[in-house]
Amino acid sequence: MARVCQVTGKAPMVGNHVSHANNKTKRRFLPNLQNRRFWSEAENRWIRLRVSNAALRTIDKKGIDVVVAELRARGDKI
């Protein structure tokens, strides 16, 4: 799946457009994904990730090395 955050797993959701007349049509809510690269002190290299804005906040809080270790523990290739 293309529009999925590599850290949080956030993916598109399905909902409704609701007009002023209360007509409903299907729409997709897309996650706010950003292609970012992070400097890893432990590996002494740049790590590229496609992450949501919520994941950026998580990386700021925990640190990129901790987040990458968690990704590798669950089997993702980084």
UniProtKB/Swiss-Prot annotation:
GO biological process, one term: translation
Coiled coil: none
Alphabetized UniProt keyword annotations: Ribonucleoprotein, Ribosomal protein
Pfam families membership: Ribosomal_L28 (PF00830)
InterPro entries, per the entry: Ribosomal_bL28, Ribosomal_bL28/bL31-like_sf, Ribosomal_bL28_bact-type, Ribosomal_bL28_sf
GO molecular function terms attached to this record: structural constituent of ribosome
Residues passing through the membrane, by range: none
Assigned GO CC terms: cytosolic large ribosomal subunit
Protein origin, superkingdom: Bacteria
NCBIfam families: L28 (TIGR00009)
Family classification: Belongs to the bacterial ribosomal protein bL28 family.
Name of the featured protein: Large ribosomal subunit protein bL28
Biological source species: Azoarcus sp. (strain BH72)
Organismal lineage: Bacteria, Pseudomonadati, Pseudomonadota, Betaproteobacteria, Rhodocyclales
GN (gene name): rpmB
